[in-house]
Amino acid sequence: ASQVTILREVERLGGLTICHSVSDIRNAFEKGKIAAIFHIEGAEAIDPDLHMLEVLHSAGLRSIGPVWSRPTIFGEGVPFSFPSTPDIGSGLTELGIALVKRCNELNIMIDLSHLNEAGFWDVARHSNAPLVATHSNAHSITLHSRNLTDKQLRAIADSDGMVGLNFAAAFLREDGKMLADVPLSQMLKHLDYLLEILGEDLSLIHI
């Protein structure tokens, strides 16, 4: 609640526009404003009956990550280990599938970053929305489970979804180390790879 209050105060002061739809985002861009979207990463706050999803949606929630690299009642995340593959653990639970379907009905975007591969494919199977991973890189370059395989990237492209480049060093460096001295060329290597598969309209910079 405190974060929502802060964001609304920043909006009141003219620093950004809180957006609830694509048209809101377009209008914000036209006015030269930052377009802000309410997002939660890891759905631990959501109860099995999805009542809190309704409450948060009423408060402005428009994007959700079902997991944050650890299990929830909805699915399983990927470990922070290197080298590693996203192909670990089981897929979405029945509650996870229900969450996906209700998010579709409420026009809440589902963020696939942090979700394991089985969960990714379950979302692809049960969601009628474009696939989105807001902060993930190319697994073919950096063998970290937080990154996306070529097959996953192609599925996102086929759905007209999008991928945001992640600036975290361990997901960029080919040795998987969390060191700050990542050259710009390494970021561009991942970005070029995403552009090759997704095209420029579906590749983003995540900050």
Question: Where do the model's predicted regions map?
Answer:
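Outer-membrane beta-barrel pore domains
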Residues: M178-L184
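Conserved small/polar residues in nucleotide/adenosyl-binding loops
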Residues: H206-I207
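Extended, charged catalytic domains and RNA/DNA-binding interfaces, predominantly
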Residues: A1-G176, M187-L202
